[in-house]
Amino acid sequence: KVDSILFSDLDVYESFEKSYLADLSKEARKLGIVIQAGTGGICPTSKSFKLKHGSAVDHLKLLIRVAKHIGSNVARCYLGSMKDRLSKGGIQQHVNQTVQVLKKVKKDALDAGVTIAVENHAGDLHSRELIELIERAGTEYVGATIDSGNATWTLENPLDTLRNLAPYAVSSGIRDSMVWQSERGVKVQWTAMGEGCTDLKAFTSEWQRLCPKLPMQLETISGFAKEFPFLDEDFWTPYSNVSARDFSRFL
């Protein structure tokens, strides 16, 4: 039975008017469903940032208002994607910008009773980097959205991602991944749960132990594989902070 759903994009709503969102929330409650509100990237220097909803700060303030009116105590968003990790200057410059944006909406989030849930998204942030971002911004109003599929795009075992982010997690988008050897390293393909190589018995057991009240919301994306040519020497520059221990657990 579905009892929780993450609307990860603002485009799902016909209107941002308070009355419309309140009616939608009322219908969800009748069905016993909790809605979590979300949007896309909120880092102004990210290659994937869009001005559709104004500046990064305006975008995030809109998300917080939507979350409040729809009855969501979560506002999911993300920094960007792997392209930002691979960009000149690396991911840290974008982390810095995202922290600045988050701090500018601190009062809005606290007044609304909403936790901004930053996701490890499309290879942008390793779980340890996301923790750094959350703690720099402030854990009283910023938390994490756990994405087990995106974990593999930062050379991380999803179990490690779960264990690291569980203390901060308020939302989730969960899927499996298949990882196999390639000529230059490995290839990764996201799959439906049970069709990849994640130890689901261990994963669900750890979930129950570490964050039993956190909804496990499935997000199925598949159909393509991405290669990580770690045997190439120049591959490692954007991943220089990935420890040998973490990488061995990924493999």
For each predicted feature, which ranges?
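Short, acidic/polar
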Residues: K1, K52-V66, T154-N164, L200
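Structural motif
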Residues: K1, S8, H69-I70, P167
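A short, hydrophobic secondary-structure junction motif
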Residues: K1-I5, I64, L102, K106, ...
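Hydrophobic faces of well-ordered beta-strands that scaffold small-molecule active sites
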Residues: D3-F7, I33-G40, A75-C77, I116-V118, ...
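Acidic-and-aromatic substrate-binding clefts and catalytic sites of carbohydrate-active enzymes
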Residues: S8-Y20, C43-A56, K83-S87, N120-S127, ...
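Active-site acidic/histidine proton-transfer and metal-coordination neighborhood
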Residues: D23-A37, S46-G143
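Conserved, mostly hydrophobic/aromatic
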Residues: A28, A67, T98, I116, ...
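Histidine-acidic metal/acid-base catalytic patches
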Residues: S127-V142, T152-L251
